[in-house]
Amino acid sequence: MKSVRYLIGLFAFIACYYLLPISTRLLWQPDETRYAEISREMLASGDWIVPHLLGLRYFEKPIAGYWINSIGQWLFGANNFGVRAGVIFATLLTAALVTWFTLRLWRDKRLALLATVIYLSLFIVYAIGTYAVLDPFIAFWLVAGMCSFWLAMQAQTWKGKSAGFLLLGITCGMGVMTKGFLALAVPVLSVLPWVATQKRWKDLFIYGWLAVISCVLTVLPWGLAIAQREPDFWHYFFWIEHIQRFALDDAQHRAPFWYYVPVIIAGSLPWLGLLPGALYTGWKNRKHSATVYLLSWTIMPLLFFSVAKGKLPTYILSCFASLAMLMAHYALLAAKNNPLALRINGWINIAFGVTGIIATFVVSPWGPMNTPVWQTFESYKVFCAWSIFSLWAFFGWYTLTNVEKTWSFAALCPLGLALLVGFSIPDRVMEGKHPQFFVEMTQESLQPSRYILTDSVGVAAGLAWSLQRDDIIMYRQTGELKYGLNYPDAKGRFVSGDEFANWLNQHRQEGIITLVLSVDRDEDINSLAIPPADAIDRQERLVLIQYRPK
């Protein structure tokens, strides 16, 4: 009976965090709008081989993540939940692997359930796992690889070992097809410390080639298909998206070596109090094979991405699966022997909630700031933000009431965030980061436009997805579409600032021409170097400028 209650509680937890509130949040640009539009175009065109964005070749990532996103929109429609359905599914599958692997390592159902709840409630997992990017997919394949390698090395027969390594190769192959060759580097680096300490080199060398073969066979069909269709894909993807992005001096998203330290700290909420103890206990018990394995899968990817020049918080998502298992194991030990870490965790959550309440007041219309984040007419959003942090502090306090029994309620600290964050985003943020909001405000003007031009790829993708059209033209800036715009068949999809006046004269009689520009908050739009317009509609950071036929 207790198991049934636990299952009902877990399903209610998943529904409140990962299902019910998702549609209340508008899509963020540039990431969510980009991936939403790529998948929409894939469904509309029926081309499941070559990814396109705004009708242009888009080679920044392979295809598998787009497949899953497309299936999400196919099943649930072109809406906010449909766009995010794929990442939510991947996150829940990863949680299922956490459950299974914890159960296999320790044979403890309670520990397995706690590891799952900790994983799903970690701030970084929830933030990325409900956000339409490709990282939850690669995290799933990496965690699946972690489980597969363990299965292979623990098997007692050659058939079991062979099956495990073949499965490992499939997960690596799908990882390559999701986000590239990092799906090969991370598993290799993560298993080497364990193989070395356990002296399991013989099994690795005897059976490892099976993983290589199954990985190649997994990638080969699509790899050959896209090489035939687009011969320069692999050259661009390998040299530009891997070498330049991560290793060279001009790598994207450059950050210092210590970049991931604050990411780990913030991402571990509401379980931050368990982080030092989980890592220390894991190191202290390094003679235990399973502990070393989990510790290696936590630390090695973190070191790898710290050394790389290009960094983003999403890159280390897979580390938190093994970390959640270590945290759950340590938490049960602490609850039984010395609950000091659990008390510290409760106080950290109280402090975080109270700090958030104070910070919300400071940036509210009633605070001391001359330019508040929320305006007076957005009072309900301020109260939503206060509710988010109040619930966080409340559940932090509740875990202290009987810490040996109530510590696990820290999983409910982000409940207010999950339910209310979509209602608390300030209008000034929505107007710049949520193209859906802009489209809703300007729908009547946008809909009849013959041509739409914009200077932001993220906004362009949002307009294309909302209006169900892929012919948005880039104006002045090419951004990440630069490579696709270089193809001969992309001629006419970019208009420079100097060419715009002539282009306008040539196309004006064909219908309404709409220009959507991103501007600074205090920028005078009358100073823009564009021909006089027939209509201007400014929505804070985005401006709609229209030219009608003459």
UniProtKB/Swiss-Prot annotation:
Disulfide bonds: none annotated. One of its GO terms (biological process) is response to iron(III) ion. Its main location: membrane. Its EC number is 2.4.2.43. Pathway: Lipopolysaccharide metabolism; 4-amino-4-deoxy-beta-L-arabinose-lipid A biosynthesis. The chain crosses the membrane at residues 7-27, 81-101, 111-133, 137-154, 165-185, 204-224, 255-275, 288-308, 315-335, 346-366, 382-402, 406-426. It catalyses: 4-amino-4-deoxy-alpha-L-arabinopyranosyl di-trans,octa-cis-undecaprenyl phosphate + lipid IVA = lipid IIA + di-trans,octa-cis-undecaprenyl phosphate. Keywords: Cell inner membrane, Cell membrane, Glycosyltransferase, Lipid A biosynthesis, Lipid biosynthesis, Lipid metabolism, Lipopolysaccharide biosynthesis, Membrane, Transferase, Transmembrane, Transmembrane helix. GO terms for cellular component: plasma membrane. PANTHER family: MANNOSYLTRANSFERASE YKCB-RELATED, UNDECAPRENYL PHOSPHATE-ALPHA-4-AMINO-4-DEOXY-L-ARABINOSE ARABINOSYL TRANSFERASE. This is Undecaprenyl phosphate-alpha-4-amino-4-deoxy-L-arabinose arabinosyl transferase. It comes from Shigella boydii serotype 18 (strain CDC 3083-94 / BS512). The lineage of its organism: Bacteria, Pseudomonadati, Pseudomonadota, Gammaproteobacteria, Enterobacterales.
